Design a protein with these regions (language model features):
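Bacterial lipoprotein signal-peptidase II cleavage site
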Residues: 18-32
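Extracellular/periplasmic bilobed ligand-binding domains
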Residues: 138-142, 207-302
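Segments of small-molecule ligand-sensing domains
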Residues: 324-341, 349-403
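Beta-alpha junction/loop-to-helix N-cap segments that form part of ligand/metal-binding clefts
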Residues: 66-73, 85-157, 166, 225-232, ...
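An alpha-beta-alpha
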Residues: 163-227, 246
Length: 413
């Protein structure tokens, strides 16, 4: 009898093992989640209200994962502040559909299609211009408007009729950093480094070069590195050998710390300038304990007490500190990243457009966006004919002592 029981137990264990193996899928799909009240099959939430879906198209993994998480926090806080909307006399619960586009342009279309299939009325994102351009084609075909948060390449909107954005553009940002390099450091020569195949970094580098040369400066070298590069010593030595006064290196967050740390190890004291993606704790941590001068251009500073900024900063910090996962996604601290403030503004802009349209239809919302003008945390927002926010100011911050300090407001010449 004991042998029979033992045999039966072994057979049961084997059966469970095969069932477990059979349930494992190797098909890779965009990572996704839904926030706020889950939608029932009827299209209503647990509260009984109808549901309006806003898609969040962001990199939660990959080279831009850290920045994508910070950018996602903005709409999440916006949804916390305003979780419902009135359309046609009815209350709708606003539900965020979050899909990970995994940073790269190759993954953009599948992540965008996932949002379309979920029935979103409008999309927010992405952190990263290349993936935004790739996803934009899908949104355009589906007739779903999108609001870029921190994607600064001009082609995001110029090549897509449904894309808007709340940030400034690379031609402006490149000009701002060129002016800063010349005014602050008296730079006459600059070395430029970007990542090959990355639309954001290559585009921003190009605009810096154009502005710097137009102002009479000399580019000693304009070089690119390939994805996965770990040793930047040859590039950094080229900057020194060329007699550069500054280094402009607008790379993804994944590479910036290595550039800073290796420059310090080589004893290079040249100021290193980055773009908006560099406003991340990984960069300030890399600078901490070194003498490196690291400066970034960005969209917002939490010390700004004008307009809606002070109220936003107070509420946002309380919200971050009330949830450990939010803090983790923000880099483990409650410093307000500029892309988070922009993300909040993008959410509120979308809500304002939907309220104006009084519709969940994408075309109606897109038309409402075109003529919209609102006061926002990062300044007033209205759009030009391309769908670009009209911006004329950038904030320069310095990475120092493990954080970022406001340095100055910089305009392009």
């Amino acid at each position: 009898m004991k042998k029979t029981i033992a045999l039966l137990l072994c057979l049961c264990m084997l059966a469970c093992l095969f069932v477990g193996c059979a349930s494992t899928s190797t098909t890779e799909k965009p990572t996704s989640e839904t926030t706020t009240t889950e939608t029932a099959a009827s299209g209503t939430s647990a509260s009984g209200n109808k549901v309006l879906k806003i898609g969040i198209f962001e990199p939660l993994t990959g080279d831009n994962g850290a920045g994508g998480k910070q950018e996602t926090l903005g709409p999440q806080y916006g949804n916390y502040v305003q979780p419902t909307i009135e359309i046609g006399g009815e209350t709708y619960d606003i539900q965020l559909e979050i899909v990970d586009n995994r940073t790269t342009a190759e993954n953009g279309p599948s992540a965008a299609s996932e949002l379309v299939n979920r029935g979103v009325s409008i999309v927010l994102g992405s952190y990263g211009s290349g993936v935004s351009m790739a996803g934009g084609k899908v949104f355009e075909e589906a007739g779903i408007p999108a609001i870029g948060i921190g994607c600064t390449n001009p082609q995001v909107t110029s090549d897509c009729s449904v894309y808007f954005r709340v940030c400034f553009l690379d031609p402006f940002q490149g000009s701002v950093m060129a002016s800063f390099a010349m005014e602050e450091f008296g730079a006459k020569k600059a070395y430029v480094l970007s990542m090959l195949g990355d639309d954001y970094t290559v585009g921003l580098a190009k605009n810096f070069v154009i502005a710097f040369e137009a102002a009479g400066g000399e580019i000693v070298a304009d070089e690119t590195f390939v994805e996965g590069t770990a040793d930047f010593s040859a590039y950094l030595n080229n900057a020194v050998a060329g007699g550069a006064d500054v280094i402009f290196a607008p790379s993804a967050i994944a590479y910036a710390p290595q550039i800073i740390e290796q420059a310090s190890a080589l004893g290079i004291s040249l100021p290193i300038l980055g773009g908006d993606t560099w406003e991340n704790s990984a960069i300030s941590d890399a600078q901490n304990g070194t003498d490196m001068q690291v400066f970034v251009s960005t969209f917002f500073d939490e010390s700004d007490e004008s307009g809606l900024a002070k109220e936003f900063v107070t509420g946002y910090k309380a919200w971050l500190n009330g949830n450990s996962q939010n803090l983790t996604n923000n880099g483990g601290n409650d410093v307000v990243a500029a892309v988070s403030a922009l993300g909040y503004d993008a959410y509120m802009t979308a809500v304002a457009a939907i309220e104006k349209a009084q519709s969940t239809d994408g075309t109606a919302i897109r038309d409402a966006l075109a003529g919209l003008s609102i006061d926002a945390v990062t300044g007033s927002i209205s759009f030009d004919a391309n769908g670009d926010a009209i911006k004329s100011t950038a904030y320069i911050k310095q990475a120092i002592d493990g954080g970022f300090q406001f340095y100055k407001v910089q305009n392009a010449d």
